[in-house]
Design a protein with these regions (language model features):
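Anaerobic metallocofactor- and corrinoid-dependent redox/one-carbon enzyme cores
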Residues: 2-471
């Protein structure tokens, strides 16, 4: 015992970081081990986890989750076309505005979403200017609904209106379809809350030139295998949420023969190619629709604890669970932590927003950051942290997708099928990398970073699942 006190002190601190912080101030070597008790100490959650682990319920959950995992992995999404939302999106009307995240009223919409809504109303000709659009949005005459409830996903504000052209992605394995609108690229754009005349002019051009060209090109091409293209893009250094250099190159390569043969004037062809070349984000929405098509195939499986939706609207974060179809489990939207563009401060940023977390729900984006170490230049952190995120996410998922792999981790399949019981039991929250929109309407993107869902979403989902299935 006496020799113990004559040796250098090396401390491992488990849990509360204040103890390790105090030791560091005294120049004592200390290793901080992040740990939280199951359920983050909530005994109701711990009790629910114990109840769900009892037979025969645990066996039913395991069988349901095996099926959900299989459906995600076996899903084979392909791009089959483009068309206007009014023609293809279930439930779309001329006075419907779809938005990102769980349901939200006009009064509770954040600045970026309100900016996008008013811009869309002007674009659709439903309002003569932004002031008129604000009055219309508040009047009750416009139907607001989540994209996810219409087989859609929407980037950032996610605002989708009748005239906008949509990707049409079909799951060849199960037959379901998913939709998302086109990338406006990375300038002052509607999805970030900008809504001045330059934004409206771009939307008009996308409706009148870009959309029809893509539609007619796909009539010639037939279909594009998105699952194969995704796997290639990850092997080329993308994570296919915020880094899309390879994916956009592959997508425009596949589209080019059809675009050239579609019969449009050379001047318009040049406009389209210059537009695509202006930003690597052109393929970003494509991956979102691909992931949505795969995850919807796993939604609605009785007894399954698999997360099929993670989405944010700048006000709340929402989850949907396979075994509890039609229900949202929400918590407060979080602050995104990451580098800001020059001239902006963290206090300028809006809260977490967008349906693009469907990529992480599928297993790419933040879950696949080990494929894209260069992403840290945009979202912050280190290469080592990016790699660790991919390893850590495997702890809260049911398996790996062998169709989409991570070369740096010995070609491990992407972590697939987030399980609410694993999240609740471990305290490990899904990691999401995302853009940051300004808190006020009319400005746009001001940075990017890392964010996690609030634990309360998983807590609510778990307790509701227990109440539904534990008899």
């Amino acid at each position: 015992m006496t020799t113990l006190f004559n040796q250098p002190l090396n401390v491992i601190n488990v849990g509360i970081a204040m103890f390790s912080d105090d030791l560091k101030k005294q120049h004592v070597p200390v290793t901080q081990l992040d740990w939280t008790p199951p359920g983050q100490g909530n005994m109701q959650v711990v009790e629910a986890l114990d109840q769900l682990a009892e037979k025969p319920l645990a066996e039913k959950i395991a069988a349901a989750n095996k099926l959900a995992l299989e459906r995600i992995i076996q899903s084979h999404p392909v791009l089959v076309g483009y068309d206007q939302a009014i023609n293809v999106v279930p439930g779309m009307t001329r006075t419907t505005i779809l938005h990102a995240g769980p349901p939200v009223s006009w009064e509770n919409m954040c600045g970026a979403m309100k900016g996008a809504v008013t811009g869309a109303l002007v674009f659709e000709g439903l309002a003569k200017d932004l002031d008129d659009a604000t009055r219309l949005a508040a009047s009750g005459d416009i139907t607001f609904s989540p994209c996810h409830e219409h087989d859609c996903v929407g980037s950032m504000a996610g605002v989708t209106s009748a005239s906008m052209f949509m990707h049409i992605v079909e799951n060849k394995t199960y037959g379901n379809r998913a939709f998302t609108n086109l990338s406006e690229q990375m300038a002052k754009i509607l999805r970030m809350g900008a809504n001045d005349q330059s934004v409206i002019d771009r939307l008009n051009w996308m409706r009148d030139v870009l959309g029809p060209m893509l539609r007619d090109a796909m009539k010639i091409i037939g279909e594009i295998d998105l699952r194969l293209m995704l796997a290639q893009a990850l092997h080329m250094g993308d994570e296919c949420h915020n880094r899309n250099n390879a994916g956009t190159t592959l997508l425009i390569q596949a589209l080019t023969p059809g675009l050239i043969q579609a019969g449009y004037p050379v001047a318009q062809q040049r406009e389209v190619f210059e537009f695509v070349a202006s930003s690597d984000y052109f393929s970003g929405p494509t991956w979102m629709a691909m992931c949505k098509a795969a995850l919807d195939a796993a939604h609605g499986i009785e007894y399954s604890t698999v997360v099929t939706t993670m989405a944010r609207n700048g006000y709340e974060f929402g989850l949907r669970i396979s075994g509890l179809p039609g229900q949202w489990f929400t918590g407060p939207a979080q602050q995104v932590i990451g580098p800001m563009f020059a001239g902006y401060k963290p206090e300028d940023s809006g809260l977490d927003i967008g349906d693009s977390a469907i990529t992480e729900t599928y297993g790419i984006g933040g879950f696949a950051m080990a494929t894209a170490p260069a992403i840290v230049a945009l979202v912050g952190g280190t290469v080592e942290e990016a790699i660790d995120f991919s390893r850590q996410m495997r702890e809260i998922t049911l398996g790996e997708n062998p169709n989409v792999t991570i070369p740096l981790l010995s070609f491990m399949g992407i972590p697939t099928a987030i399980d609410i019981t694993r999240v609740a039991g471990s305290g490990i929250l899904p990691v999401i990398n995302t853009a940051i929109a300004h808190k006020d309407a009319g400005i746009g993107m001001i940075g990017a970073g890392i964010v996690h869902p609030p634990f309360s979403c998983f807590e609510k989902a778990l307790l509701t699942f227990r109440d539904r299935y534990f008899l």
